Design a protein with these regions (language model features):
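Classical protein tyrosine phosphatase
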Residues: 168-182
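Conserved N-terminal entry element of GNAT/NAT acetyltransferase domains
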Residues: 2-61, 210-235
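Active-site/acyl-donor-binding loops of N-acyltransferases
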Residues: 181-228, 286-316, 329, 339-407
Length: 407
C-alpha cells in the first residue's frame, strides 16, 4: 500500500475506490464526498478555466478542437483526425450544461523584434465533461459527468499538468453544478490501483480482406439473413430503441446512457450509427457503431461500442425441451443481424478497420469474429486493456457483459 501511495501520489489522494481500501470492499457505500471539494495543491484556478458549451466563444472552440486534433493521440502508426463536429456535438443537447476546461499560458507578442503591449495565450491542456445517466440494478438512477478528451501539450507532459486539470476540472464541475457529484472516466492501457467499474479488452480487426459476409459458408446464417429485416435507426425511430433497452434492462447490472436529446444529436451529426433487427413493431437486436476518427496505417476505423441480443436474452428466460436449439438459432440470428449491419455501415463509410469494445453483448460478436479470423487464417490487429472507473463513487466491479453503455 505504501508503494502504491508513493508511486501514484495523486490518485492515492483522489475520491476513488482504491484496491487497498478494506472499508470499501466491506461496504461499497456509493458517493464518497457529498460536500464540495476543497482547494488543494493540485487545484489551479489561476491558469485553468472552465467554460460552458453554451457560452464559450467560437474562436476558442476552433482553437480547442485544433489542439485536440493535433495532440490527443501521437503514434507512428495511428492518426486521430476529428472535425469540430466530432468533438463538440457530443457536448450539445444534454439536460445539464457540458463543460470544456482549458489550461492557457500567456505569451507576449513581438513585432519587428520589439515586445508589444499585446498578450495572446497558448493552450497547454484541454479536458471536457458531459452529463450522462447511470442506473445500477435495483437502485435509483442518478446523473454523472463523463470526463473525456484529456489532452496535454507534449512540451508540458510529465510536469503535473494532467493532475491539475483533473482536480480543477472536477472542482469547477462541482462548483457550477451542485446536482452532479460523480464522474466517469475511461482509461485505455494498463490499469492503475483503482478498482474499475468494469475492465475489458478492445479488439482491432482488419476487415478489408476478410469474408465477413459470405453467407454461403453457413447455411444457418444464410437462412437467417434471408428473413431478417435490419434497419438504420434514426431520430424518428428512437422510441423503438428506448423501448427495447427498457425491455432488456434486467439483463444488465449497470446501464449508462446519454439524454435522449443528446442521442438524437449524435445520430443527426453522424457521430454514431444505430442498426436494429426489427420484427413487426419491435426490435429483436441492436448494434451501435461510432466513428472514433482513428486511422491505423492510414486505414479508417469504425467502432462497435454496444449491442443487445434480444433473441438469446429472451430465450434464456424460457424453460422448454427445445431451449438449447432455440438458443443456437437465436444466437445465429443475432450474429447474422450484426453481419448485415456491419455490411451496411462498411459500405456507407468505406471503413476497413473494426474495433469491438467487449461490453454488453459484444462478447458474442467478439467470439464470432475471433473464430472467423482463426478459420480464415487472418491475424487480429491488437487487443488493448480498457476500463471505466467512477470518481467520487464506490461500487464493486461488474462483468463486462453486464455493462450497457452508449457514449
Amino acid at each position: 500500500m505504501g508503494y502504491i501511495k508513493i508511486k501514484m501520489k495523486f490518485w492515492s489522494q483522489q475520491p476513488v475506490f482504491h484496491i487497498y481500501n478494506l472499508l470499501y470492499w466491506l461496504n461499497p457505500s456509493g458517493i464518497i464526498n457529498k460536500e464540495m471539494p476543497v482547494i488543494n495543491k493540485y487545484t489551479n484556478i489561476i491558469d485553468i478555466k472552465s467554460y460552458g458549451i453554451s457560452e464559450i466563444k467560437d474562436t476558442l472552440l476552433e482553437r480547442l478542437c485544433h489542439f485536440i486534433k493535433i495532440y490527443y493521440i501521437q503514434s507512428s502508426n495511428t492518426t486521430y483526425s476529428p472535425t469540430k463536429t466530432n468533438i463538440i456535438e457530443y457536448l450539445k443537447c444534454c439536460n445539464h450544461e457540458s463543460y470544456l476546461t482549458l489550461y492557457e499560458k500567456n505569451k507576449l507578442l513581438f513585432e519587428k523584434g520589439q515586445v508589444t503591449n499585446s498578450i495572446s495565450t497558448d493552450i497547454v491542456s484541454v479536458i471536457t465533461a458531459r452529463s450522462m445517466n447511470i442506473t445500477f440494478k435495483n437502485k435509483p438512477a442518478f446523473t454523472l459527468y463523463y470526463v473525456d478528451n484529456l489532452c496535454v501539450h507534449p512540451d508540458y507532459r510529465k510536469h503535473g499538468i494532467a493532475q491539475q486539470m483533473i482536480e480543477t476540472h472536477y472542482y469547477n464541475l462541482r462548483k457550477n453544478n451542485k446536482k452532479i457529484q460523480v464522474c466517469l472516466f475511461k482509461r485505455e492501457g494498463e490499469l492503475n490501483a483503482i478498482v474499475p467499474l468494469v475492465a475489458y479488452k478492445t479488439t482491432g480487426y482488419n476487415i478489408k480482406n476478410v469474408s465477413l459476409f459470405n453467407t454461403s459458408s453457413s447455411s444457418s446464417f444464410s437462412q437467417n439473413q434471408q428473413y431478417l429485416n435490419v434497419i438504420e435507426i434514426g431520430s424518428s425511430q428512437l422510441s423503438l430503441l428506448l423501448d427495447f433497452v427498457y425491455s432488456q434492462k434486467h439483463n444488465f447490472e449497470c446501464i449508462i446512457m446519454p439524454d435522449v436529446s443528446n442521442i438524437i444529436n449524435m445520430i443527426k451529426t453522424e457521430n454514431i450509427y444505430i442498426y436494429g433487427v426489427i420484427n413487426g413493431t419491435y426490435l429483436s437486436a441492436v448494434y451501435v457503431f461510432r466513428k472514433p476518427n482513428l486511422y491505423y496505417e492510414r486505414e479508417e476505423a469504425l467502432e462497435c461500442i454496444m449491442s443487445i441480443d434480444g433473441f438469446t436474452n429472451n430465450d434464456n428466460n424460457d424453460n422448454n425441451d427445445n431451449n438449447c436449439n432455440n438458443s443456437q438459432n437465436n444466437n445465429n440470428s443475432f450474429i447474422a443481424g450484426f453481419n448485415i449491419s456491419l455490411n451496411k455501415i462498411k459500405e456507407k463509410l468505406k471503413t476497413t478497420i473494426l474495433l469491438v469494445e467487449n461490453t454488453s453483448n459484444n462478447n458474442k460478436i467478439k467470439y464470432y469474429l475471433n473464430k472467423l479470423f482463426i478459420t480464415q487464417k487472418n491475424d487480429i490487429l491488437f487487443e488493448s486493456p480498457t476500463a471505466f472507473f467512477l470518481y467520487n463513487y464506490v461500487s464493486y466491479s461488474i462483468p463486462s457483459e453486464k455493462l450497457l453503455i452508449l457514449y
